[in-house]
Amino acid sequence: MAGRHQNRSFPLPGVQSSGQVHAFGNCSDSDILEEDAEVYELRSRGKEKVRRSTSRDRLDDIIVLTKDIQEGDTLNAIALQYCCTVADIKRVNNLISDQDFFALRSIKIPVKKFSSLTETLCPPKGRQTSRHSSVQYSSEQQEILPANDSLAYSDSAGSFLKEVDRDIEQIVKCTDNKRENLNEVVSALTAQQMRFEPDNKNTQRKDPYYGADWGIGWWTAVVIMLIVGIITPVFYLLYYEILAKVDVSHHSTVDSSHLHSKITPPSQQREMENGIVPTKGIHFSQQDDHKLYSQDSQSPAAQQET
């Protein structure tokens, strides 16, 4: 019984080198090794899971291009040219400082898969699983873009030169330079010069703002301002003064005619109604008026004498 009790006694908890604390010492060494061998992977939760998924997506969308370093190239210039950051270039090329860039002959550039830089190149086969397994294009494939640009430039330059040659041929055909004497050649050249001079003058005199002011010059604008501001008001005032004078003269003639009709005797009025011009009557009426005026002037003098 005593032996059984001794076997059932519980020893103190022991701490292993792995950092696991065992409260009971009845387990054998084989059980301990099995527990140490079992390693459980914890699931990522929250932001860590999102970060890992986004990092994997970014790695899948990135393609690494190799570029030969030339004179005058810098990290900032390459980053601006390929629309990436300097930090990404350093991370791909394992550069610690900017000075390490000058020790390289070629540099790796991370570029998005579906971008304007890679749309003319052949897409890689298969899916990328890690950063180091990204596809690197050879220098021959990278030279496709500059070769196409040079071909397009040479074609445009050749077409331009052909058009210039055609224009020169047409000018030579149009102008007849065959002359017998030097004087005729000089006269022909001077005539052509005189033709081109007025065209050049017209082009120089042309106003760059032509059309904004209906094509009028500054002097025409000044004339219009003088007409509207000075000449028009003067004519307006003169017109109204003439109208006022005409009205006054008309009223004066009407009043004089009324007075004359009151002074004329009834016999003269009858002659005027019958259509006879009363010349004598008018003379006599004037004499009668003079006599009446003289009598009226003499009457107060006679009264004073009496």
Curated annotation (Swiss-Prot):
Gene Ontology MF: a single term: peptidoglycan binding
Top-level taxon in the UniProt lineage: Eukaryota
Subcellular location: Cell membrane; Golgi apparatus
SMART domains recorded: LysM (SM00257)
Induction data: Up-regulated by Golgi stress-inducing agent nigericin.
Parts of the chain on the Extracellular side: 1-217
Residues with PTM Phosphoserine: 55
LysM domain ranges (all copies): 65-109
Membrane topology summary: Single-pass membrane protein
UniProt main location, coarse: membrane
Regions that span the bilayer: 218-238
Function text: Essential for Golgi structural integrity.
Keywords in alphabetical order: Cell membrane, Glycoprotein, Golgi apparatus, Membrane, Phosphoprotein, Transmembrane, Transmembrane helix
The protein's name: LysM and putative peptidoglycan-binding domain-containing protein 3
Ranges in the topological domain labelled Cytoplasmic: 239-306
One GO biological process term: Golgi organization
SUPFAM superfamilies, sorted: LysM domain
GO cellular component, one term: Golgi apparatus
Glycosylation sites recorded in the entry for this protein: 7
Short name of one Pfam family: LysM
